[in-house]
């Protein structure tokens, strides 16, 4: 059962109970009162679709019996059903009270009294409510005068008792209602029809202020005396300021040609004032005069809140929202709201909107009418009399509100019938001093200039018109960043936002500032976007009504007249908003780049052809609303391929590993282009790239501005940049980078060949992906240990130990590392360094600071085997092959002697190694601290010695280790002093002299 049917069934029971309890029945008016007293609400006529109580009860023939009386009234009695027959019989047996009978008889006699009311000379005025009822009755269909009583009683449930309003006959009623009722004589008799008002026939537009534009009401002539000396007043003749008016009174014309000019002007002013008084009085007597002044003030207040105009269909709703009360035009005597607004033309002005096909209501005082030239004067020729020279001059000189006020007493609809339009215009064109065409051109020019100035004025100077946001610069490979996953389409198509002080906090600050700025109503209205600016690709802002925040958006497409689809560049999603909620974006809010980064999960592809809904849902649950750790892999077609890891628990959870375990994805060792972003990539369409060519070179060479890693507790740390004091190394950075890239292509191949020949290096070869256990870390996933990324290798721009105390390597070390390991630094850097930089003799061991303790001990143990000389020879040869091409490009002239000394030491060390094959004991014996101090102070101590053992011969390195930024990378004492980057003295000076 619907809600309407439930209300109707409940209403039937309530009306039956009310009528059964009354023995003599109730009139429709009494039924309304009794229902209000019993229920507390009025009858739900509008909800059920009825116009009157009589129409409601006629639709209930099984509940209500309509009994007409001889006096024209209607009595409603209940029709009992099976359950209420007993109650009805008991009520019928009740005795009738004499007091009730006398009161009812007195009431009926007072209503239907045939006594003629006393009235004075002024005829009675038909109340507005009665006039509204007559309009409602005749709006359906015309009614014969002989059937008027029956039709009125059928419609409203009561007879039309005109005598209680002061009328003596129905003829007087029709005469008083002649402005709304027209009587036509037909063969069947007098036919009453509803007269169309002048406001419906032709739209009236009047200047605000002194002009009252109520239609002139036809009064009875000769039926009664008004008590005013002027009995016949007509305004059919034109009246001018500069000419003596024609006499409008019913008396003989008095010649005015012999009077002086002063008396003529004073007489003209008096007549003009008298005419204005007549018009204002007639306007107050008209339909608008029946409206309460307080109510008119309220209506004007509501309309004044909309300077751009209020649609007439929304006037009643806005009135109820502002004053919490309903505005009923019928209770005021008007058929609808259009007629009410037309009657209030002294405070309101109506214009027709061709775009919305609706009427717009304006406050006449806030926005006065602008003249539209002779064309509008022809259309509204009743505004101004065109055959007077002074009026034409007023229009041509100053088409403003003041000029309209000066001609306020000229010919209007009061005295200008439509049939005289052509005659008036012909008179105007016959005047030789009136120029029409130049006036039209001038007005059109003013209109175009006005529209242009308004268009420029509506756009704030700091509003964004054709500007685009910039994207964030690309991240470096293997960089660890904190991210929020903002919007997910699939694991291969989602958007992330970096969580850092430079991004997320700046975005929050900007949104707070935008909310503070645009929440001001004046600012919000100032930055409203016109219709012609709402185009795809335009950058603007919008407020979401749910959370009251303002967001930067880019218009994607226009859905209709009221809605557009927008892209949120800071969050990645697409939504639908209203055109009216769009605002211009201030230029100061475009400095922050678009924060949403299009991403794809690295090294995964769907198990099926497309991602399933379960896979997408599982990926959404993994992301959640928490910060994640992202490991940058690479960019493909501008899309960031990134590993996502959840470090909130004790164990790190890699998302691609979870998707593979659940069977949603397949892990592969390469990234495929995202199909979703290939079809539609809003950041590429609507934003500009912010990467410079110089920055791209540094990124490709593996020299990031900042690198990140995880410590032993799983926290995200930031590796600090090294202090670069040598300006020469920075100047040679780009010149050496090209050669290093060339060497990086051949270097790994040579290293691989040399390592394959040595059987003891076979354990360092990468494993086959098929042999990898699925329960362990996925294949190729970077090992997030507390190990630095190969920054502690030897620097060519080394300085003496005293000058280098506490300093790390220069940028050339970064470049050399990148040339060795290529793009995937974090995968093979440890293996390559183990292959190239470990020597077999205990004297010549050079430990890297990032090398783990277990591997250092393993290498140290292998150096004491009898096969050490062979390994030493092969490794020295490998080192010579690797390092000579890289060192043939000197970085500075001061390093040439040192490089020559280094080459000589390599040759001597090779010769000494060949000569020392017969003395394995000397090789197996580790170098003592005393020998190292006596031979070379710059030599590196053995891996097994501690820094304390060298306190007598070398400077104390404790402060250097404490101040070094890489001390956390050492896992044992074997690499404690390797942070001080000195040239490795492979052969002691004393042995070289003996040789």
Curated annotation (Swiss-Prot):
SMART domains: TUDOR
Positions of modified residues (Phosphoserine): 946
Domain Tudor: residue ranges: 533-592
GO terms under cellular component: chromatoid body; pi-body; synapse
This protein's record includes keyword Phosphoprotein: yes
Residues of the HTH OST-type domain: 7-80, 122-197, 291-365
Location relative to the cell: Cytoplasm
A Pfam family that the UniProt record links to this protein: TUDOR
GO terms of biological process kind: P granule organization; spermatid development; transposable element silencing by piRNA-mediated DNA methylation
Its biological purpose: Required during spermiogenesis to participate in the repression transposable elements and prevent their mobilization, which is essential for the germline integrity. Probably acts via the piRNA metabolic process, which mediates the repression of transposable elements during meiosis by forming complexes composed of piRNAs and Piwi proteins and govern the methylation and subsequent repression of transposons. Required for chromatoid body (CB) assembly.
Name this polypeptide is given: Tudor domain-containing protein 5
Taxonomic classification: Eukaryota, Metazoa, Chordata, Craniata, Vertebrata
């Amino acid at each position: 059962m619907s809600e309407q049917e439930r209300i109707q069934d409940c209403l039937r029971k309530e009306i039956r109970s009310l009528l059964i309890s009354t023995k003599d029945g109730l009139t429709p008016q009494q039924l309304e009162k009794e229902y209000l007293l019993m229920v507390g609400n009025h009858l739900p006529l509008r909800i059920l679709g009825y116009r009157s109580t009589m129409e409601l009860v006629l639709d209930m023939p099984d509940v209500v019996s309509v009994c007409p009386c001889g006096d024209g009234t209607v009595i409603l009695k209940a029709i009992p059903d099976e359950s209420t027959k007993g109650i009805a019989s008991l009520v019928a047996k009740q005795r009738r009270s004499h007091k009730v009978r006398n009161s009812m008889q007195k009431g009926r006699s007072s209503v239907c009294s045939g006594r003629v009311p006393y009235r004075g000379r002024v005829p009675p005025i038909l109340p507005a409510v009665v006039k509204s009822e007559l309009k409602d009755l005749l709006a359906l269909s015309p009614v014969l005068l002989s059937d008027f009583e029956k039709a009125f009683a059928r419609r409203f449930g009561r007879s039309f008792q005109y005598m209680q309003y002061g009328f003596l006959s129905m003829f007087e009623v029709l005469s008083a209602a002649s402005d709304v009722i027209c009587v036509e004589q037909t063969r069947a008799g007098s036919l009453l029809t509803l007269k169309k008002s002048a406001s419906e026939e032709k739209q009236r537009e009047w200047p605000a202020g002194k002009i009252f534009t109520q239609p002139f009401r036809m009064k009875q002539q000769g039926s009664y005396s008004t008590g005013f000396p002027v009995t016949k007043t007509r305004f059919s003749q034109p009246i001018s300021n500069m000419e003596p008016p024609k006499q409008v009174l019913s008396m003989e014309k008095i010649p005015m040609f012999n009077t002086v000019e002063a008396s003529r002007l004073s007489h003209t002013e008096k007549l003009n004032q008298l005419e204005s008084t007549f018009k204002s009085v007639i306007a107050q007597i008209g339909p608008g005069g029946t409206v309460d002044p307080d109510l008119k003030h309220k209506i004007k207040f509501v309309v004044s809140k909309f300077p751009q105009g209020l649609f007439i269909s929304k006037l009643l709703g806005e009135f109820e929202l502002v004053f919490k009360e309903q505005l009923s035009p019928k209770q005021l005597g008007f058929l609808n709201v259009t007629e009410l607004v037309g009657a209030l033309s002294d405070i309101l002005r109506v214009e027709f909107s061709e775009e919305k096909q609706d009427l717009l209501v304006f406050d006449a005082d806030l926005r006065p009418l602008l003249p539209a030239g002779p064309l509008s004067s022809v259309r509204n020729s009743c505004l101004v009399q065109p055959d007077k020279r002074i009026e034409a001059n007023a229009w041509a000189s100053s088409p403003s509100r003041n000029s309209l006020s000066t001609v306020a007493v000229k010919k209007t609809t009061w005295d200008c019938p439509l049939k005289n339009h052509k005659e008036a215009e012909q008179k105007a064109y016959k005047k030789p001093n009136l120029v029409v065409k130049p006036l039209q051109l001038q007005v059109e020019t003013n209109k175009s200039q006005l529209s242009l100035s308004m268009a420029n004025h509506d756009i704030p100077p700091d509003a964004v018109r054709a500007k685009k946001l910039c994207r964030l610069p690309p991240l470096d490979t293997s960089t660890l960043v904190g991210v929020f996953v903002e919007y997910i389409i699939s694991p291969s198509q989602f958007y992330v936002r970096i969580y850092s002080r430079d991004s997320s906090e700046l975005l929050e600050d900007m949104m707070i500032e935008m909310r503070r700025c645009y929440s001001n109503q004046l600012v919000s209205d100032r930055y409203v976007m016109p219709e012609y600016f709402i185009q795809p690709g335009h950058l603007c802002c919008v407020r979401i009504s749910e959370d009251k925040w303002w967001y930067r958006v880019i218009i994607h497409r226009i859905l209709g007249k009221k809605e557009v689809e927008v892209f949120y560049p800071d969050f990645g999603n697409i939504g639908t908003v209203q055109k009216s909620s769009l605002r211009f974006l201030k230029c100061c809010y475009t400095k922050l780049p678009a924060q949403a980064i299009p991403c794809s999960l690295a090294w995964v592809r769907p198990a099926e052809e497309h991602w399933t809904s379960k896979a997408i849902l599982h990926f959404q649950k993994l992301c959640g609303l928490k910060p994640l750790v992202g490991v940058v892999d690479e960019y493909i077609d501008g899309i960031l391929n990134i590993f996502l890891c959840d470090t909130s628990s004790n164990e790190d959870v890699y998302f691609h590993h979870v998707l593979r375990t659940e069977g949603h994805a397949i892990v592969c060792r390469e990234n495929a282009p995202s199909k979703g972003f290939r079809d539609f990539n809003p950041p590429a369409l609507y934003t500009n790239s912010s990467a410079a060519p110089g920055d791209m070179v540094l990124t490709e060479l593996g020299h990031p501005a900042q690198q990140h890693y995880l410590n032993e507790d799983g926290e995200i740390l930031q590796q600090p940049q090294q202090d670069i004091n040598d300006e020469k190394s920075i100047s040679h950075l780009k010149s050496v980078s090209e050669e290093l890239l060339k060497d990086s292509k051949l270097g790994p191949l040579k290293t691989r060949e040399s390592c394959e020949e040595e059987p003891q290096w076979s354990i360092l070869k990468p494993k086959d992906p098929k042999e990898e256990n699925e329960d362990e870390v996925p294949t190729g996933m970077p090992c997030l240990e507390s190990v630095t990324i190969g920054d502690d290798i030897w620097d060519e721009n080394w300085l003496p130990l005293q000058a280098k105390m506490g300093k790390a390597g220069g940028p050339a070390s970064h470049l050399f590392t990148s040339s060795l390991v290529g793009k995937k630094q974090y995968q093979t850097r440890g293996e390559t360094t183990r292959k190239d930089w470990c020597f077999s003799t205990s004297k010549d061991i050079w430990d890297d600071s990032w090398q783990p303790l277990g591997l250092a001990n393993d290498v140290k143990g292998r150096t004491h085997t009898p096969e050490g000389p062979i390994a030493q020879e092969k490794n020295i040869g490998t080192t010579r092959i690797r390092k000579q091409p890289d060192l043939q490009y000197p970085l500075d002239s001061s390093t040439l002697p040192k490089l020559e000394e280094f080459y000589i030491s390599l040759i001597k060390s090779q010769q000494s190694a060949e000569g020392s094959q017969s003395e394995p004991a000397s090789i197996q014996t580790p170098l003592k601290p005393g020998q190292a101090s006596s031979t070379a102070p710059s030599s590196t101590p053995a891996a097994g010695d501690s820094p304390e053992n060298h306190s007598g011969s070398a400077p104390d390195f404790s402060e250097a280790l404490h101040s070094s930024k890489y001390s956390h990378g050492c896992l044992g004492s074997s690499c404690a002093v390797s942070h001080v980057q000195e040239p490795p003295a492979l052969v002691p000076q004393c042995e070289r002299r003996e040789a």
